[in-house]
Amino acid sequence: MKGKRVIAGILLVGIIAVTLTGCKHTDSSKKETEKSVITLGSDNYPPYNYLNEDGVPTGIDVELATEAFKRMGYQVDVVQINWEKKKELVESGEIDCIMGCFSMEGRLDDYRWAGPYIASRQVVAVNENSDIYKLSDLEGKNLAVQSTTKPEGIFLKRTDERIPKLGNLISLPHWELIYTFLGKGYVDAVAAHEESVVQYMKDYDIRFRILEEPLMVVGIGVAFAKEDDRGICEQMDRTLEEMRQDGTSLKIIEKYLDDPQKYLEVDDLGY
């Protein structure tokens, strides 16, 4: 009987061990599955990120992110976010990163960055019959920007001596509204990424005039939380550079923008 008890005990221990090992494997697999999807937060901002006719996210950043994360072994879930709360969302972990024509300029200490992967001009646009031809002509004028964007900071801080004092700076929550305000004459000018202005004119068959003198040439990057030490940001940085070098980024950008090569000239941006 004693021998039978010992054998039974050994069998019981073995069964428990196998069960626990199975549970551990299941938990591990679950964690790996959870890690395999990167949640990318972005605003609706054509041509970088927008919903196509089928309601599926598409655009320059969506295609670049999908390819980059695929090379890294991840799937990407692109979600539309409240752009004004982007920092809060990435720091809380609700999203893994921010990628939506997001300028690195003036924000280097706020996030952990991958990039720059695109160079973009911040410009001022006016109606075709406007008497505004250079930045100094904006003195006393009313100008609209999307809130929390780089142009808003440029006109609020006025650290650049070329930037005059406006009559009013109108900050609006959505990028489309700034063009509506300009088209209806509620403001004299708008400031935004040049690609956004060009895309809006194309989509709505409307003509604005872009001032030749840019506000700034900025680098576009992917932002992760400052405390994110998973190494994904650094891997993303290397992968985006590989895509720039092997021609993948050029092929993606040329689907959306004319003269795509100029947007990849990021080496002299100083980041």
What role is predicted for each listed range?
Residues 24, 62-71, 129-132, 136-150, ...:
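Extended ligand-binding regions for polar small-molecule ligands
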Residues 53, 65-74, 151-173, 201-205:
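Ligand-binding cleft/hinge of the Venus flytrap
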Residues 1-10:
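Bacterial N-terminal signal peptides that target proteins for export
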Residues 30-101, 171, 235-236, 246:
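Extracytoplasmic small-molecule ligand-binding "clamshell" domains
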Residues 42-44, 119-126, 202-238, 259-271:
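Periplasmic-binding protein-like
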Residues 66, 75-137, 209, 214:
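Acidic, polar ligand-binding/catalytic clefts
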Residues 19-22:
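C-terminal motif of bacterial Sec signal peptides marking the signal peptidase cleavage site
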Residues 85-88, 101-110, 154-157, 181-217:
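A ligand-binding cleft/hinge motif common to bilobed small-molecule-binding domains
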